[in-house]
Amino acid sequence: RDIDVSGFDTSNVTNMGYMFCNSGFHKSEDLRNFDTSKVTNMADMFAWCVCLESLDLSGFDTSNVVNMTEMFDSCYNMTSLNISGFDTSKVTSMRYMFRDCNVLRKINMKGFNTSNVTDMSGMFQNCDAMTSLNVTGIDTSHVTDMAHMFFGCRSLKKLVLTGFDTSGVTDMSGMFSGCTGVTSVDVSSFDTSKVTGMSGMFRGCLSLTSLDVSGFDTSEVTDMNSMFYGCTKLTSVNVSGFDTSKVTDLG
């Protein structure tokens, strides 16, 4: 069923959370004149819009948005997404932002200001069609949660994490779990001094042939369950320097 919002006056709207969630909305051209200048909440705005194939939000004013949690979650059929004009300088949560965007091949985050983001858990989870992702330049200095961030990105061959600041991160559980196509991932510069959760961090990385975790500070880690489970092509991994004094689960 068509949802025509082309005539809406949204100049005073502050909350657009769940606005089109689980609806038949599919015409992004209706949003060309949307005034989003006062909006602070866009959580789940387009979540479960399974009829949506293309979405152009380049004209959205997101300068006051704080919450983008699950904004595009489970847009199963969306092949094109334009968020090139997004101002994310006030955003604190991008949790599950693109989760289950199964056929989306590219996400352009160039210009994203993520300096205030604290939660990136599950951000790209199950983006099955994405073959490469460059998050170089993304400011992660305030992020505390990266659990399942790249979980299930099965087609991902190349993942560039240059400059990733993980100094404040406490949870990396399942961060790369299920990235079955990745042959190598450079985490040698990761600061893991505050991390408590590493369970399933590399679980199911079937193609992973090299991994340098020799510099990991694991002094605060309590859970390493299945950390390298299913890494069948990984012939060696140096964990000789791991401090497991606080670990309660090594299953």
Regions found by a protein language model. Give the residues of each.
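Short beta-strand elements of solenoid repeat domains
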Residues: Y18-N22, D44-W48, T69-S74, Y96-D100, ...
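Structural signature of tandem-repeat unit edges
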Residues: R1-T14, G24-T40, C51-V66, Y76-T92, ...
